[in-house]
UniProtKB/Swiss-Prot annotation:
UniProt GO cellular component terms: chloroplast; ribonucleoprotein complex; ribosome
Disulfide bond residue pairs: none
One Pfam entry name: Ribosomal_L5_C
A Gene Ontology biological process term: translation
Family: Belongs to the universal ribosomal protein uL5 family.
Oligomer and partners: Part of the 50S ribosomal subunit; contacts the 5S rRNA.
Subcellular localization, as worded in the UniProt entry: Plastid, Chloroplast
Name of this chain's protein: Large ribosomal subunit protein uL5c
Keyword RNA-binding annotated: yes
PROSITE patterns in the record: RIBOSOMAL_L5 (PS00358)
UniProt keyword RNA-binding, yes or no: yes
Cross-referenced SUPFAM superfamilies: RL5-like (SSF55282)
Length: 180
């Protein structure tokens, strides 16, 4: 079964972008390539329970098991050894990516307290968008009673767009609630 946003993209958004930007064919239309959810855990090297619970939360949110990110080199000031776990990350592609984007736009972001929209200036110059969330409670999959600590996460939406304006257009068409 194909995801709702994937069908919306193929049937409504892509033709609209072809007409608006005067692309010669449908393959020139920028698409969302992947979504990367990352959570850095500074104190995870001392406590494996934090690491495990964070990995389970990201698995619930993304619908796919994450991987541990490890330190590349030792830093004595942070009591950090080389190759110790420092975070977790999940890369979503295909149907799972569209399912997560749908839940993010329609369920999670509206549940943020005092939500006014997300910052339209968080593009990287190549059409990719990054967004930081301060807590995981906005996702309906997370049970408030089962979390041990409120932790945030970084979400990067990587597109095939060449410019920020193209990336903005595609995310706006998907319904991303940008600030005016």
């Amino acid at each position: 079964m194909t995801e709702r946003l994937k069908v919306v993209f193929q049937e409504k958004i892509a033709p609209k972008l072809i007409e608006k930007n005067r692309y010669k064919n449908k393959h020139q239309v920028p698409v969302i390539e992947k979504i990367v959810i990352n959570r850095g855990l500074g104190n995870a090297s001392q406590n494996t329970k934090i690491l495990e619970s964070s990995l389970n939360e990201l698995t619930l949110i993304a619908g796919q098991r994450g991987v541990l990110t490890r330190s590349k080199k030792a830093i004595a000031a942070f009591k950090l050894r080389e190759k110790t776990p420092v975070g977790v990350a999940v890369t979503l592609r295909g149907d799972r990516m569209y399912a997560f984007l749908d839940r993010l736009i329609n369920l999670a972001l509206p549940r943020i307290r005092d939500f006014q929209g997300i910052n339209p200036k968080s593009f990287d110059g190549l059409g990719n968008y990054s967004l930081g969330l301060e807590e995981q409670l906005m996702f309906p999959e997370i049970d408030y009673d089962k979390i041990d600590q409120i932790r945030g996460m970084d979400i990067s939406i990587i597109t095939t767009a060449k410019k920020d304006s193209e990336g903005f257009q595609i995310l706006k068409e998907f319904g991303m609630p940008f600030k005016e």
